[in-house]
Amino acid sequence: MMGAKVVTGRSTTQGLAQQHGGVSNVVETPFNQASCCGPVSWTSGCHSLTESRCSRLLYILLHVGASAICCLLLSKTVVERVWGKAHGIQMPSVLCAHLFGSSDCPVLSGSGAVYRVCAGTATFHLLQAVLLVRLHSPTNPRAQLHNSFWSLKLLFLLGLCVVAFCIPDEDLFPAWHYIGICGGFTFILLQLVLITAFAQSWNKNWQTGAAQDCSWLLGVSLATLGFYSMAGVGAVLLFHQYTHPDGCLLNKMLLSLHLCFCGLLSLLSIAPCIRRKQPNSGLLQASIISCYIMYLTFSALSSRPPETITFQGQNHTLCLPGRNKMEPQIPDTSVAVFSAGIMYACVLFACNEASYLAELFGPLWIIKVYKYEFQKPSVCFCCPQTVEPEDGQRSRARSADQETPPAAQVQSQHLSYSYSGFHFAFFLASLYVMVTLTNWFSYEEAELEKTFTKGSWATFWVKVASCWACVLLYLGLLLAPLLAPHSESPPP
């Protein structure tokens, strides 16, 4: 997780280059030039980053680029100004007749285009996830599929997107829509698991230090106060911006309910019956969850359609950020951009952390990450950097202090993160981005401008449900040990 650093080995070609001295210097340049299409790692010419970081960065850039293209194709303003087409970009009639035998062809913009681009990126990552399953060593030939052949992989990705555009709407939408919904919900659950594991690991880590040194107790207190302050300020701003004395009853009820959830989870975190089974349970983890609940509440309220009431013979729009008087309101695009930015940052966080934990704890990382107990505290406030071997499993370790560049590395024996898990997380992320941009269940008339400014009830209730799922998940983590009365509690 954040703060944990990785030491990875250099590629085989670089190791041979160092051993053979001058001869390798002549051969190294052609190999570096061919690395985009060949098996030589692209990072052989990148001495400031490790191979794993370079590969991960490039995949992130590919995903960001694909998501940006989806936004442009979904934007009615961009389509009208760039292509001058008010009803979307049409496929050339000659190509359309050749592929489909008629003039009824898929539109190259709008929600259909988003579905097709995301279908290409999702298939791209799913295929790599399958091909890289049970890969644990960077020296395995299959690791080159992840770290090399960049030009070929880019062409393959473009080819998948082109093939998706050749599929008629009636064949694509019915099945792919439900696949996207299932993948989107799965990715939401993955995010919730990660944020609860993040909160619990941070709390266990620093509470372990607080039991040994008072300075750690000060850090726990300051962090707890900081998160509760952010949650409180967020709640006040939400009441001020998204409620009105003459309306917005649903917003008021939702905010009040979620504040009650935060209070309930905080009380349970320090309840004596909970602390007997979980001595390290405390307000730090509850404050992090409370802060995340307020973010999910903001995300839900900013995604709902505005409320309109009649006052003195005039229609007035309420429940939008900005003015709190009985005056016409306009959508605030800055709030939409801020919400979209946080959403995508959470997407990238989930993809990277899931791949790291999958390699650190193995296939059952979702369960093992909650059971891990820290033996000594670390300034790194999240997950363990080293997991001891258990029942014959291999040991996986991360360096906590520095990351040595490739020029001074010894070849690593294990991956710093799970390549297969990384691609599967991006497969789910592609589906999540697809359904989020197209308003989940109401994708037919989706437009970028409406998605982030006018909202939809489908998106609103999905985000409310994700908030309630977060509450239930954390509540289950607190109460689950009580269901096993004969289990021994770990030492504080």
UniProtKB/Swiss-Prot annotation:
Write down the membrane topology.
Multi-pass membrane protein
Principal place of residence = membrane
Entries under Pfam families matching the protein: Serinc
Q: Give one GO biological process term.
A: phospholipid biosynthetic process
* One CC-aspect GO term: membrane
- State the compartments where it is located: Membrane
- Which keywords does UniProt give here? Lipid biosynthesis, Lipid metabolism, Membrane, Phospholipid biosynthesis, Phospholipid metabolism, Transmembrane, Transmembrane helix
Transmembrane stretches in the record are: 59-79, 113-133, 148-168, 179-199, 219-239, 254-274, 281-301, 330-350, 421-441, 464-484
| Protein's job | Incorporates a polar amino acid serine into membranes and facilitates the synthesis of two serine-derived lipids, phosphatidylserine and sphingolipids.
Family membership noted in the UniProt record: Belongs to the TDE1 family.
Record-linked PANTHER family: SERINE INCORPORATOR (PTHR10383), SERINE INCORPORATOR 4 (PTHR10383:SF5)
Protein name per its UniProtKB record:
Serine incorporator 4
Organism, per UniProt?
Answer: Mus musculus (Mouse)
Name the gene behind this protein. Serinc4
